[in-house]
């Protein structure tokens, strides 16, 4: 900022501002001045654009006008929310000195820094989404990645081995703010994300990270957390923790542990798969018609967030899955009783985080009290459920009767928003507070008595006693009777139609009342802070209970969904394979106006790949996606939309479904398709579930068919993954005849004249035709174009045998049986008579043939 160059020429107040701003050069500084937060210079210009507020000028300092913008202090949360949503960070600078006793500018300091990844205020957070701060680190061996949800204390790290895995993690976690080292090499991974923060290299130093983490957890080493041998992850975690402490300006007691996330613990899904399956976000970027929109009928925000974490990290531990299944089954008869009580618990998880940060507001404590009041009823209902996992969950929930009693005594039923407004602590909680309040509240009675007495003493019927926030207490007499005011009445204020006076007795009482109000408010703030001190020793138990309540909400929700939507409990088997009887797509069946056609699926070591053919709009993509979604739901422990499901081990789910140009990276549709295909061929295993839809369609027919054939061969013969391979290349239906483990299925349709009816049912065998022209007509392509297309189709189908030796079912020309072209060198040799050549001619022919090869 150029203003710093002439520092001594500025006014004392602007010097104070510039010193504070120099400590936070990269972020906006909200500088408190009375009832406003002001921004100056470049901050003011930036804020006026981001917030659409007026840009003005504040006089001059150092001979230059000062650009200025301001917002009222009481509306600051709304403006902070707008800035945070745009990825901005803000330093909040408050007046901490007393203006009455200050010589020069009032003392100010930055009391907190609001950043997109470290917010905990209820008004700034999306209640049903995690809000993560993340840090990324890279060295020659791979990546380190750490995430922290400061609104819950959940701290995780991982070590993605390659770029694709790192990209998948970024999409899964979708951090609100991402810290990266100043020499980070893979900038294309993170470019375009909001909330990027460039950090110096020393913040990622491994020894500093270990020291930071041990200090936070009160441990000597990190062995107990299972992260000791994760140096790259620890580098990221150390930077992240230091950043969180720097911005919060307080201890973080709710962050008590760190967990290592390992690839082998969950089903891996790359970024393309998460996008294509529309788990929590649809392809248009919204939340409608996603898997979460169907499954998430949780009644608490913390339950909703946990369910979304489960959906994005399906677990592979069948012990955990069977426990969840058992719990869901046991709870199905209890959902109607449990959900109304759980709804009253609210977002206890985030309230506890604000308690730990000492930023909890009075209404947070009132909500906490209300949550505690539900626990006895919840525990009583759960006690009647005959299920060991349910009882284990119940044991994690304390009753906290003492804390409930404390909050019932301490906080009024409906407290104000802020403690500074007063009236938070209940009557009877503190004797001294009650005395000060009685003195302040008794003012009304006193004023009424004084008014009656003075009116009788003076005989002035217009006399009345009142209070004004600016001038304090007064005795008011109309202008017509003011000349009759007693001599001891001292004029305090003149109005148009009246005079206001003060008398020594009233002045003395005013001082007493105002003192009592100030002391009552100061004592109330002290008692409020003491409540934190009484609650915080129980923080660990409270967080454990909040986690158990969130899990109960998820499981009760899944039980309700299973019953309402007619889901069945899947069976886990040890061998490779998926067998589904009458499977349904969980989202499509909810949005269709007509009944959904359920379909079977059978994948096993002897039937690893299904070649799926059929018309456009016939349901191939729906069939493939429903298989992946049923597998995903099974591996979060949920019941699934089918009559019966048996499912074996799955380590990864891959999808190559649809594509669009990646213009920002300069990649065409076909390039995107091939990149995703390469990722599958490199990383899939025999325990992977692979969905391949229309491979090779983005290039020439020969190239596309050849690639599709080779990919199918590789997946079936080399990788041996469980694969659903949808295609319009009818030549691929020959694959089952050429290799084992492959079968043909198709989705049927009926054509009548120019109309087509899609049956949406899966049948064995290959489709007889593609119905492409019928679908085009259905889409509204002009009739003359359809007519010309039919003519061209007949020409192509009747093409000479030299161009296409074989046809598939008489409807599509074969592209695999095109005769190979003869080499020019071979043709020349066939026409050559060696006996007629001279030695010189023979030598010339050798050179000629050499040029033809």
Swiss-Prot record:
Name under which the protein is recorded: DNA mismatch repair protein MutS
InterPro entries, alphabetized: DNA_mismatch_repair_MutS, DNA_mismatch_repair_MutS-lik_N, DNA_mismatch_repair_MutS/MSH, DNA_mismatch_repair_MutS_C, DNA_mismatch_repair_MutS_clamp, DNA_mismatch_repair_MutS_core, DNA_mismatch_repair_MutS_N, DNA_mismatch_repair_MutS_sf
Keywords: ATP-binding, DNA damage, DNA repair, DNA-binding, Nucleotide-binding
Gene Ontology, cellular component aspect: cytosol
Family: Belongs to the DNA mismatch repair MutS family.
GO BP term, pick one: mismatch repair
Matching Gene3D superfamilies: 1.10.1420.10, 6.10.140.430, DNA repair protein MutS, domain I, MutS, connector domain, P-loop containing nucleotide triphosphate hydrolases
Superkingdom: Bacteria
Record NCBIfam families: mutS1, PRK05399.1
Binding annotation for ATP: 614-621
